[in-house]
Structure formats: C-alpha cells, structure tokens
C-alpha cells in the first residue's frame, strides 16, 4: 500500500496531477479541495494517498490531509459509491461540512453536488451516519459544537450530537457522566468523544 507521496509536482490537469518521486512519475487523482491548495508546478508537494487496485488497473488518489483520505475511504464503503463520486463529494464539501451534513442528515447539501441525486444523497446519509463520526470524531465533534454552540441546554445538545454521530444512548450518557454541570457544548462534545474513542 502506498500511504504517502512526496516529490516534485510536474503537471496539474484537474482532477489529475503528476508527481515525480525519486525519478518515478506517479499519476494521482485528487479532489478539487486538494487541487486548489497545491503549490505551483516545479515545486515540492507531499500528499496522503489511497491506492485502489481494480481489474482495469491500479489507481492512486491524493489528499492534502489525512482527514480527507479517511472521509474518502468511508465514502467508498457506501453501496453504489465509486471513487469518482467520492471525489465529487469531497470537491463539493469540506470534510467538516460533510460531517455536519451527515450528522444533521442534510440531504439538500449533497444534492447540490454534480452527480448526486436525491436517492444517492439519502443512501450516503444513512450509511455514513454510524461511520463518519467514529472515523473522524474530532472533525465531526468540532463542527457540531460550532452549530450547537448557542443553544441553552448544553447537556441536551451534547447528547443529541453524540447520537447524531452514531453512538447509542447508553454510550453517550456513559461518556457524559463525568462532565461538570457548567461544561459548554463544544468542550462537552470534545471530552465525551475523547472518552468514547478510548472505549
């Protein structure tokens, strides 16, 4: 498995790029979120990668952050979602926006992405609901905390956020036991996710 590539950025032809790593030129497909952050050609670049081996060839995908790659891998686990669609999703939404859309079940945000219809969006939300929050707890928790930050009942918001991330009520309440009464939503979600990730 090729997990990371560092080398000279030779070509940029969205969504493909060519990276020279020690004399070997690697073709990678990247989401537009990564593409727009790339340096100029002729300079060094380092990307997290995912290698897909299929009957019709080997395909390498590059990502600016490990969170993007993790989200890509979770998207590939959704039935009927291939690499092209997964790249389209990450090109249309940041990882934190995707985490929020999944947690709050916002199909409307997904159908705005080219190639994503209503049924596909609903399937994505359903199948990712129990996976994305656990795969990316810090991103999802921080995003939900930002959304719920102004709500008056912090404990209720923390519980709802954890349930939206795919944890059951018993797990969520167990993680909330040690929280102080005056804990804010943002800190509460962060502390609870920390405990749940160790469980």
UniProtKB/Swiss-Prot annotation:
Pfam families attached to this UniProt entry: HHH_5 (PF14520), RuvA_C (PF07499), RuvA_N (PF01330)
Annotated region described as Domain III, given as residue ranges: 154-199
Record's keyword terms, sorted: Cytoplasm, DNA damage, DNA recombination, DNA repair, DNA-binding
Chain intervals for the UniProt region annotation (Domain I): 1-64
Alphabetical GO biological process terms: DNA recombination; DNA repair
Molecular function as annotated in GO: ATP binding; four-way junction DNA binding; four-way junction helicase activity
UniProt xrefs under CDD domains: UBA_RuvA_C (cd14332)
Record-linked InterPro entries: DNA_helicase_Holl-junc_RuvA_I, Hlx-hairpin-Hlx_DNA-bd_motif, NA-bd_OB-fold, RuvA, RuvA_2-like, RuvA_C, RuvA_C_sf
Compartment annotation: Cytoplasm
UniProt-annotated stretches for the region Domain II: 65-143
Keyword DNA-binding recorded: yes
Region (Flexible linker): 144-154
Assigned GO CC terms: cytoplasm; Holliday junction helicase complex; Holliday junction resolvase complex
Protein family according to the UniProt entry: Belongs to the RuvA family.
Purpose of the protein: The RuvA-RuvB-RuvC complex processes Holliday junction (HJ) DNA during genetic recombination and DNA repair, while the RuvA-RuvB complex plays an important role in the rescue of blocked DNA replication forks via replication fork reversal (RFR). RuvA specifically binds to HJ cruciform DNA, conferring on it an open structure. The RuvB hexamer acts as an ATP-dependent pump, pulling dsDNA into and through the RuvAB complex. HJ branch migration allows RuvC to scan DNA until it finds its consensus sequence, where it cleaves and resolves the cruciform DNA.
UniProt domain comment: Has three domains with a flexible linker between the domains II and III and assumes an 'L' shape. Domain III is highly mobile and contacts RuvB.
Protein name stated in the entry: Holliday junction branch migration complex subunit RuvA
Organism of this sequence: Azoarcus sp. (strain BH72)
């Amino acid at each position: 498995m090729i997990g990371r590539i560092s080398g000279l950025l030779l070509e940029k032809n969205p969504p493909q790029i060519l990276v020279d790593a020690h004399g070997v030129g690697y073709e990678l497909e990247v989401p537009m979120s990564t593409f727009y952050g790339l340096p100029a050609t002729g300079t060094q670049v380092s990307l997290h990668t995912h290698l897909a081996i299929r009957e019709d060839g080997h395909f390498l995908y590059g990502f600016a952050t490990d969170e993007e790659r993790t989200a890509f891998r979770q998207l590939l686990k959704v039935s009927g979602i291939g690499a092209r669609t997964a790249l389209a999703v990450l090109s249309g939404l940041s990882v934190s926006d995707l985490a929020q859309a999944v947690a709050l079940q916002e199909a409307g945000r997904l159908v705005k992405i080219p190639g994503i219809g209503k049924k596909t969006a609903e399937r994505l939300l359903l199948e990712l609901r129990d996976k994305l929050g656990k795969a990316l707890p810090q991103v999802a928790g921080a995003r939900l905390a930002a959304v719920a930050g102004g709500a008056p009942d912090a404990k209720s918001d923390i519980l709802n956020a954890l349930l939206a991330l795919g944890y059951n009520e018993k797990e969520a309440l167990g993680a909330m036991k040690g929280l102080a009464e005056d804990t804010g939503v943002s800190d509460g979600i962060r502390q609870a996710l920390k405990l749940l990730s160790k469980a």
